[in-house]
Amino acid sequence: MPIQILPARLANQIAAGEVVERPASVVKELVENSIDAGATRIDIDIEKGGSKLIRIRDNGSGIPKDELTLALSRHATSKITSLDDLEAIVSLGFRGEALASISSVSRLTLTSRTVAQEEAWSAYAEGREMNVKLKPAAHPIGTTIDVVDLFFNTPARRKFLRADKTEFTHIDELLKRIALSRLDVTINLRHNGKMVRQYRAAQTKPQIEKRLAAVCGANFLQHALEVELEHGELKFHGWISSPEGARAQGDIQYCYVNGRMMKDKLINHAIRQGYESSLPANQYAAYILFIEINPHDVDVNVHPAKHEVRFHQARLVHDFIYQAIFGALQQGASLPDVVGHIQSEAEEQQLESKESYFPPMKEYVRQPQQTHYPKSEQLRAAVESTPSYPNKAPLDSWIPKGNVGSSSSNSTAPSRSFHTDKPTKKALSNYNELLTTQNREQRESTSQVNEQSHTFRSTQQIERVAPQVTQVSKNGITLGKVLSVVESTFALLQQGKQLQLLNLRYAEFVKIYGQLSSVNVEPLKPQPLLIPLSVGIDESICNNLSNYASLLKSLGIDLKVKNRTNIIVMAVCQPIRQQNLQQLIPNLLRYLEQINPSLEQVIKWLSHQIQHDEVSYTTAQAIQLVMELEQLWGDELNNFYPKLLKDIDITQVIQAFSHE
């Protein structure tokens, strides 16, 4: 068979395989065209599930007479003229394939009139070459498209259509999605001459709620939590169901990117992660969510049906969505009564002996059973591992190396270790930058201060030298060489001929305490959160927030009042940046309200609160932790013995070998 150019109708029929899957696909393309034309009212008439008739009528801007012929041609559109336009696309359609593809598999008539025209014109294509014929018609300003006998000339496609009721159900669901995306557009749907849906345009809040209830049901509205988050040009808003409003199936899950319906895997995964600790595996969240992003930062030309997009900063978008969902659920949940627990902790700290550095380890690291907040191992791992802001989404399975959709079972799988096998040069460099609280001149002057023994670190200035990649402490004293890790929580050290065992979990605590105690030298540097965090607090605490402004500022914590029961966390210091700020900040404010503590008491209280997962340390992690301790404390680490470090006596083992 020789190579030849396909006839126009055959080429369009082949292309229609991607664009026109079923009657609902036709409705989608035509209704989106009406919205792009600025229509505020769209009427849809369906007969026999769309196989007999699909009629879309709108009051949009219409199509001029001299453009009607082009409208039915392939790759003809008024929405883009260059690649730059595609990269900044804001319209729902842009390929110019819909009308040509639909007309090739049906009997299509396009009737339209613009404001500038005195009469309307109808266009239809016929014949092998799809020649377009025009004739005058009576029609108001706007456009009407009649699609008759869908797939009449492609029997193979027609036989795959389902029953009329099934096909109409798909159309009904599609229009629900569109009705939610454009609340300002009136949409009427008829089937076989009977009015089935009437979605009136909504402007006020009661009207919007009424439309939401009409689409999703009153039960969704009853359990809906409004969510809104903004960061630069990235905006996120909508409604999500509380855990009490969860459903047995995922039938109310609507997501939009710049007004475009989406079924994107990355977005779905972020939403699932946000609900992971709130819903059991057999329940589904209900949500209506809108993402607004700079068109230059998203590629919509990925999927033929435009159901998927590609974000230029996928990780940022994923975590942004996760943060918004998780934060809204935390605010919507009723907070447990923790006042009594905090009061008892405060009394214990006030009675603590001044000569004692620390109470037993179990009093400093809170055990899981002491808190009443719901937890998730993956969420805690996520909080620990994020370098950007609290509540960052888990990293273990979202990146689409293969099929991201497979991550739906992620909540039942064991959590992957979130530590790297070894500290990278970049990690060490970042750590160096984060912990440096003095400039070079200050460090040079500080290094000249005579060394002296300190009886209590928090009451005297402590020399701070930025950590270096080499394992040398600020006083030239090291803990020794890390040989191995024992039982995942202890490091075996060699100091000369002496072997020692280091408690790695207690070492983490000592590191955090040292970082917080540097506030006695100068205020901790606030680090702005990538996305400001909204936190719910008691109204009385919010009213007295100004009383703690100076203390919070010295700790590098920047809070702003949002309303009477909510504050915005703008920045926190590095030591607490990786904690669950949704819980830590309200607890801190309650503690300040209870006893009006001193700065030193707050430092010790914060050291109590900071939690760590039951981590299985690797040798590389142990080496890095030892290095950090040496830079923070130097020879002052002696003050934390023997809870931190114990000598190992191998004399008996040597003697046992000698007697064999």
Swiss-Prot record:
Annotated family: Belongs to the DNA mismatch repair MutL/HexB family.
Gene3D superfamilies, sorted: 3.30.230.10, Histidine kinase-like ATPase, C-terminal domain, MutL, C-terminal domain, dimerisation subdomain, MutL, C-terminal domain, regulatory subdomain
GO CC term (a single one): mismatch repair complex
Descriptive protein name: DNA mismatch repair protein MutL
Membrane-spanning segments: none
UniProt signal peptide: none
Gene Ontology annotations of biological process type: mismatch repair
The protein's role, per its UniProt record: This protein is involved in the repair of mismatches in DNA. It is required for dam-dependent methyl-directed DNA mismatch repair. May act as a 'molecular matchmaker', a protein that promotes the formation of a stable complex between two or more DNA-binding proteins in an ATP-dependent manner without itself being part of a final effector complex.
HAMAP family to which the protein is assigned, alphabetical: DNA_mis_repair
CDD domains: HATPase_MutL-MLH-PMS-like, MutL_Trans_MutL
Organism: Aliivibrio fischeri (strain ATCC 700601 / ES114) (Vibrio fischeri)
SMART domains reported for this sequence: DNA_mis_repair (SM01340), MutL_C (SM00853)
Lineage, highest ranks first: Bacteria, Pseudomonadati, Pseudomonadota, Gammaproteobacteria, Vibrionales
Keywords noted in UniProt: DNA damage, DNA repair
Iron-sulfur found in the keyword field: no
Region ranges (Disordered): 368-426, 439-461
Molecular-function GO terms, alphabetical: ATP binding; ATP hydrolysis activity; ATP-dependent DNA damage sensor activity; mismatched DNA binding
Keyword set includes Membrane: no
Annotated Pfam families: DNA_mis_repair (PF01119), HATPase_c_3 (PF13589), MutL_C (PF08676)
Low complexity biased stretches: 406-417
